[in-house]
Amino acid sequence: MKIRASIRKICEKCRLIRRRRRIMVICCNSKHKQKQG
């Protein structure tokens, strides 16, 4: 899980979701997981 100020999709399978007022990226590739900090 990477924590970044600006997050974006890395591949086509990445999905932007909102959890507990935070924007996150989930993907089948676990290296693409991101959270906005």
Curated annotation (Swiss-Prot):
Tell me, which GO biological process terms does this entry list? translation
Check the record and name the Pfam families matching this protein: Ribosomal_L36
UniProt keyword annotations, A-Z: Chloroplast, Plastid, Ribonucleoprotein, Ribosomal protein
Tell me where in or outside the cell this protein is found: Plastid, Chloroplast
Instruction: Tell whether Ribosomal protein is among the UniProt keywords.
Output: yes
**Domain of life of the organism in this record?**
Eukaryota
InterPro entries, sorted? Ribosomal_bL36, Ribosomal_bL36_sp
Q: What Gene Ontology terms describe what this protein does at the molecular function level?
A: structural constituent of ribosome
Primary localization class, coarse = plastid
Of the GO CC terms on this record, one is:
chloroplast
Which family is annotated? Belongs to the bacterial ribosomal protein bL36 family.
Q: What is this protein called?
A: Large ribosomal subunit protein bL36c
Taxon lineage: Eukaryota, Viridiplantae, Streptophyta, Embryophyta, Tracheophyta
